[in-house]
Amino acid sequence: MLLRPLIAALLAVAFPALAAAPDAATLEKIDRTFADWRLSAHAPGLVYGVVADGRLVHVKGLGVQDTATKTPVTPDTLFRIASMSKAFTALAILKLRDDGRLSLDAPAETYVPELKGWRYPTTDARKITVRDLITHTAGFVEDNPWGDRQQVLSEAEFTRMLADGVPFARTPGLAMEYSNFGYATLGRIVANVSGATYQDYIRREIMAPLGMASSGYDVLASPQDRRALGYRWQDGKWVREADMKDGAFGAMGGVETSASDYARWVAFLLSAWPARDDPEAGPLRRATVREIVEGANYPAAPMRRAGVSATPCRQAMTYAMGWQVIQDCELGRVVTHTGGYPGYGSIVLLLPDAGVGVFAFASRTYGGPALPAWRAALLLEAAGALKTAPLPVSPGLATAYEAARDVWRKGEITAAPLANNVLLDLDAAAWRRRLAALRTEVGACAAGEPVTATSAMEGTFTWTCEHGRLTGRVQRAPTPAVTLQALDLSVAPP
């Protein structure tokens, strides 16, 4: 495969525009936030980056790769990213689905025959599906940090584990409970369906097309002079964590990558928004990538991580496909995942509606830099460096809005093409009285301001009038011809 043309095409796609590039003062605050965290967290090495408009706009390495050699961390230093690896496995499954090679709703035993003899916790339990494994709803027990230490398990040992079966925490499909074992099983599905190891499949089908040449799973084969070695902080000093070789559980947490490589991954994911008519330019379709934010039906409502800001913030959160999806009170939709591993901690925040991502990798056991990453995102938001791209006004919405203007100018609801519900909900005479009352209160309105689309079928507007402002909403009916099913008008507060 010719990588350069594909990468160039990927980076040339349209991204939602930032309100403004991060200014020097904001970047200085972000740098200080990460630097302070590294010292307080006793992380030997740290690298972080900000991706916007399809490129790495800011990246910085702090500390050292190796406490003995004092080699400084750079954007090309290799870190293990632990559970942030799950996103690669999830997209590998979705790619195989797109290629017609598996079904998300098929029993997992269809692709892993060792599961066929399993004993389920209740007689009315349905069989585990591939989708259950992706969304952590298979009924397995939460297995941190047991799962991390299974990294070195051989494929033969994993086969025996699968054949023996595992105890269930609950019946499949009843709740979300995080399972590294489940994602290791997805790795086996990738291997069985593709005919390659999951490592080779993900490198060939996802990493290589994105130009992630330094990324992979086998840390013992990586350039050792570029690796950030893992440490734990114990008794006031750094203690080297032993490297765990690649194994069967790597599908849940085995990826090693650099900031330079990972920025390509983040840019690719963000390029899936907004939905548009542009040619496809990546290893998976944009619509497939957007599936990662479709959460399972087990929402939570936690408070935002303590220490991120002085403002309390309750979030809505669910787990989707290799990602947590959060609705934040300040940042809006955030697609995120952390990684914790012996010797490493990591986090990524995607703000898909703004086309911006923040990520960070550290070389301390379970020392994930979530706190400074969230603070960095809030600093970008406060600086006006995040902006949701406006939706285009569809031709049908433009026609509906012009009809709403005609209603106002003529004082008659029947001046617009109406869906059959409108006059049943409020007759023409009542509409006439309502419009007249509004005109008496606000006077003449030029109605020249544009409509703001909230979808292809609906929009809002504000008109400046002689004695105030009028706000409104216009909504098309789901009919082939443009008809209005709703027109709301009200006087804006002073």
Where are these regions (language model features)?
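N-terminal signal peptide c-region/cleavage motif recognized by signal peptidases
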Residues: 14-16
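Short, conserved catalytic-motif segment at the N-terminal edge
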Residues: 22-79, 101-103, 114-118, 155, ...
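Short active-site loop at a secondary-structure junction
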Residues: 36-48, 68-133, 169-181, 250-253, ...
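Short, surface-exposed loop or secondary-structure junction motifs
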Residues: 62-67, 120-340
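Short, gly/Ser/Thr-rich active-site loops of penicillin-recognizing serine hydrolases
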Residues: 299-305, 332, 360-430, 494
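Short, well-ordered beta-strand elements
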Residues: 347-350, 354-364, 471-473, 484-489
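Short solvent-exposed beta->alpha transition segments
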Residues: 412-454
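Exposed beta-sheet edge and beta->alpha loop/turn motif
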Residues: 452-494
